[in-house]
Amino acid sequence: MMVGCENSKKSDSGSNEDKSLSDDIINLDQGDPTAFQEYWMKKKDRCTVVIPAWDLMSYFSDTKNVCWFLEPELEKAIKALHGAIGNAATEERYIVVGTGSSQLCQAALFALSSLSEVKPVSIVAAVPYYSTYVEEASYLQSTLYKWEGDARTFDKKGPYIELVTSPNNPDGIMREPVVNRREGGKVIHDLAYYWPHYTPITRRQDHDLMLFTFSKITGHAGSRIGWALVKDIEVAKKMVHYLTINSIGVSKESQTRATTILNELTKTCRTQSESFFEYGYEKMKSRWERLREVVESGDAFTLPNYPQDFCNFFGKTLSTSPAFAWLGYKEERDLGSLLKEKKVLTRGGDRCGCNKRYVRVSMLSRDDDFDVSLQRLATIKDLKCVEP
């Protein structure tokens, strides 16, 4: 089977031809969002940031703000972008900036659990869940909270916090809370992928605590910027306290870069020829079509099917093209180990609370890595091709 290649410039990881003939390992375990690099190369004159040596020297940005290290211009840019896309309410909310959404998730766990009268607070998420949640809830062995696993089977009495990722990482499904009681429960809505290049924007999310990350919108993971939209001032204050102890704020250089790029997104989002979201949607759609072509050409793998829905941002019915593929194997076998033999690294389903015959595959790699991963996947035509 021939697997087509997307048009792309040679990246710093080498050419498509060289890599396909080599023994290079393709790492699709990490969600390193380098897929959009080509778009930003064309924006170098409009998105380059120059910072004088004397600027941004203070710890403080706005001492009157609950989040005193949040740059005022970044706050404006965040509100403007959410307003333009229509994916989240920002009115009557406090914006807390963090070093990526992972730090903010930990800050939110601290804030919500420390405000609880009963401790430790149970932390749950529905299977398959984002694997890092387990690490974030368990690493410090905190007395404030404790990881309790699958939200669907959770029946423990007492306070709890449910982590809801929508669209879900790893399977791309839109999610709502599943714990069958509300007494003593709090919810953290992780909306990192609720953007129109991944999924139709069907409504404006309006929750008490919502997390977003710069990296998964634009691909600028190296800037380490995320933000939380928080309704309760006491929760916001607790989160800021955690961030103050943890890192004494967030890099102003990163905030300045994020401000420039978010403003560019807002400015061009309705211009089809320049819109990042148009570009991102077409790229993700193409990648998913090519992956499905490979999967459907054989009898070894499975992928989730996603319903089409009307996107309020694009004004038309669209398909879903998640940032990760939840790839399944039709027999009970460790799919991660099988793909590793093909020199493709993925995240095993057991890390997401599921069976090892599932893996999470990043759809956000550079073009050449994605192309070669499809070529290697295509060599596994059916179950008979694989030695037991």
UniProtKB/Swiss-Prot annotation:
Superkingdom of the organism of origin: Eukaryota
Phenotype upon loss of function: No visible phenotype.
Main localisation: cytoplasm
Compartmental location: Cytoplasm
Cofactor section: pyridoxal 5'-phosphate
Residue list for modification N6-(pyridoxal phosphate)lysine: 216
BP-aspect Gene Ontology terms: auxin biosynthetic process; cotyledon development; cotyledon vascular tissue pattern formation; embryo development ending in seed dormancy; primary root development; response to ethylene
Molecular-function GO terms, alphabetical: carbon-sulfur lyase activity; L-tryptophan:2-oxoglutarate aminotransferase activity; L-tryptophan:pyruvate aminotransferase activity
Activity regulation, per record: Inhibited by L-kynurenine.
PANTHER family registered for this protein in UniProt: BIFUNCTIONAL ASPARTATE AMINOTRANSFERASE AND GLUTAMATE/ASPARTATE-PREPHENATE AMINOTRANSFERASE-RELATED, TRYPTOPHAN AMINOTRANSFERASE-RELATED PROTEIN 1
Protein name: Tryptophan aminotransferase-related protein 1
